[in-house]
């Protein structure tokens, strides 16, 4: 019976070779397409994880209702499982760029660490400083040398693109400008891409304007008023860089650190960023 069946199969193929080849090719294409879809997701995750590691992207972001102080930063540094901590200041403001008013988020930047980093390949921010977290990549121009200079988003979609040499002037905010900024005018020295602002179409929400941040800028810590507190702290977790993001191994490390903060320490709110370390 098996011989008869095999003989009939051979006859069916030889009588309609064209149809058989067409079905075989369609099946092969379908299998190849499906395999490609499966591999695309894996390859994208691997590429993203390599980028996160190359820019020392934070695993957690710690915030406080009234901001953070040096005592809070010291407490965070002593939490078991914390690899490194970088306190940061962020503030949204109305700023004039090319005679147009936009909502710009100003971020503090360790200028020495930035200048000592190597971003020449456009994908990595090589630095020996573990506390230099969420390292921007310089696309054009140079890093700021002082409080009167800044680098801005290379991918911001504005009516007129920002260029090296342009001037940004802060003209307003949610309160008195002097309570937040010690300086309100900056010369753009470079354009950057930041792992903290991955979505080029959306840099975050704001209480100002239409509710969206139009662009971001990195400025010297001295830009802010003397009494302006840290608005948060970027944290990297021990062992997170060795895990692929996203993965169960990575999530367990980040979740354990958040749980440890909640149950063992009286610290400000701690939120996973959803990005690898």
Regions found by a protein language model. Give the residues of each.
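Membrane transport/envelope proteins' first extracytoplasmic loop
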Residues: 2-23, 27-277
